[in-house]
A protein has these predicted regions:
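Extracellular/periplasmic helix-exit of transmembrane alpha-helices
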Residues: 108-123, 273-296, 357-391
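Flexible loop linkers connecting adjacent transmembrane helices
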Residues: 2-5, 37-43, 70-89, 114-138, ...
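Helix-loop-helix connectors at the membrane interface of multi-pass transporters/channels
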Residues: 1-5, 171-186, 211-234, 266-272, ...
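Helix-loop-helix module between adjacent transmembrane segments
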Residues: 5-8, 12-15, 19-29, 62-67, ...
Length: 451
């Protein structure tokens, strides 16, 4: 049925998604502060009333995926029974990581543990006390651990099954075919695909915005480039141009190569801080991270602050993270499925949950503990600009500036951040084009570049 109804780029999908995005942008520009306040009010209401749903829903998804992982369905292959994986494990992981986490890791690596240690989320602990620091790592590991990756894995698994096992079009709506039946090819399915495009664009906009702020901060600290809007617009244009070139070269030449460079640069930064920083403390934090995470996860995965001990905290942190990640999930899930054809369901779940989580724990242990150690030795060196003044984008570069060879490591960090965002935009363009066309590789190059 799916093969006989090959879907091409659809006007309803394209124009409904593009129209909504344009109306949103025009309204934001036209009404300025009023529009921003309206968006903030809507977001605040959703967070206040549905934090329980975000937290409980993501945790329920994790339990579901664990059940699938250990069941007989774990042996199913995403594709024909004789399909082989297209990418090796290292390349596969690099591409998974670049699409799912990317520069977010560099943005929050030093900043989030420092924020929570300075302003403990709960428990009445003194700022920067031992208890506050332990709790800071508990929440950081929770936010960037298995739960974040669960949000990507579920749609990726569903799309991978229906597209590669059931031979349906490469669209987000395909995973809703059990609910929609034949209507998946009609207006309901097309509107779901348009929603996937909108979510991808909005999720990417948040990430690119954070990335531009961090790149701008790094250039300011490294080369004294002024923190002004024209510079930031120039950064956006440069990244967009680079992403356009990358997407034109295709998945194997663009995303694959950049992903490998990204993960190599990330590991180099991690090793550098580990060896030149308080090595024994960092090794101890890495070792303890797995125990801290395993011990705190069963409680935190269902904690919603129902007694209102810290009003608004979830809306700023956990619920915001999950909402933001859900916006990303159609794109990242589809991309995960695209590069995982030929792998079993068990391989897919294990690879998209366990490997990235392990890497995240190590990264945050190194950069978070290094930042806290620096703050303990020189109070205010990081908390004043990053926490009190809210200049989170400079956290990584302020940290690296206190280490030797900053001209080298700071430049490397900038290059890695830029490459991560080029990879994200490249991958998003490929996936959005698939949502609109239902095909993996048949659209003209200028379609993908246009997206």
């Amino acid at each position: 049925m799916a093969r006989t109804r090959r879907l091409q780029s659809d006007p309803l999908i394209f124009f409904s998604a593009l129209g909504f995005i344009l109306v949103f942008v025009v309204a934001t520009l036209a009404f300025g502060d009023r529009a921003r306040q309206t968006y903030a009010d809507i977001s605040g209401w959703l967070m206040d009333h549905f934090t329980w749903l975000y937290v409980g829903g993501v945790s329920a998804t994790l339990i579901f995926l664990i059940v699938v992982f250990v069941s007989r369905y774990g042996n199913l292959r995403l594709g024909d029974d004789d399909d082989e994986p297209e990418y090796s494990y290292p390349v596969w992981f690099a591409m998974l990581f670049a699409a799912g986490m990317g520069a977010t890791l560099l943005f929050w690596g030093a900043a989030e543990p420092l924020n929570h240690a300075y302003n403990p989320p709960r428990g009445g602990y003194d700022s920067m006390s031992r208890e506050a620091i332990i709790q800071a790592f508990q929440f950081t590991y929770y936010h960037f651990g298995i739960h974040m990756w669960v949000i990507f894995t579920l749609p990726g698994l569903a799309v991978g099954y229906f597209v590669y096992k059931r031979k349906m079009p490469a669209r987000m709506s395909s995973m809703f075919s059990p609910l929609l039946g034949g209507k998946v090819y009609d207006t309901p399915g097309k509107l779901l695909d348009a929603l996937g495009i909108i979510g991808t664009v909005f999720g990417l906009a948040v990430s690119v915005g954070l990335g531009v702020l961090q790149i701008s901060a790094g250039m300011n600290i490294l080369w004294d480039v002024p923190l002004v809007t024209p510079v930031q617009i120039g950064i956006i244009c440069a990244i967009t141009l680079a992403a356009s070139i990358s997407v034109a070269t295709g998945l194997d030449k663009g995303v694959k190569i950049l992903s490998n460079l990204n993960i190599a640069g990330t590991i180099l930064l991690m090793i550098f801080v580990l060896l030149t920083g308080p090595t024994l403390k960092l090794l101890g934090q890495i070792t303890e991270s797995f125990g801290i995470y395993a011990q705190s996860l069963p409680e935190l995965m269902f904690w919603v602050d129902s007694y209102n001990d810290n009003p608004g905290w979830h809306a700023t942190w956990t619920a915001f993270y999950w909402a933001w990640t859900i916006c990303w999930s159609p794109f990242v899930g589809m991309f995960f499925a695209r590069i995982s054809r030929g792998r079993t369901v068990r391989e897919f779940i294990g690879g998209t949950l366990l490997l990235p989580t392990t890497f995240d724990l190590i990264w945050f242990s190194i950069f978070g503990r290094a930042a806290i150690d620096m703050e303990e030795k020189d109070p205010g060196v990081l908390t004043t600009p990053v926490v009190e003044e809210g200049d989170t984008p400079q956290a990584l570069f302020t940290l690296l500036a206190e280490y030797p060879l900053y001209a080298v490591t700071g430049t490397l960090a900038l290059v890695v951040i830029v490459f991560y965002f080029v990879t994200s935009m490249d991958s998003a363009a490929l996936v959005v084009d698939m949502f609109a066309s239902g095909e993996e590789n048949k659209s003209p190059t200028f379609y993908r570049v246009g997206w």
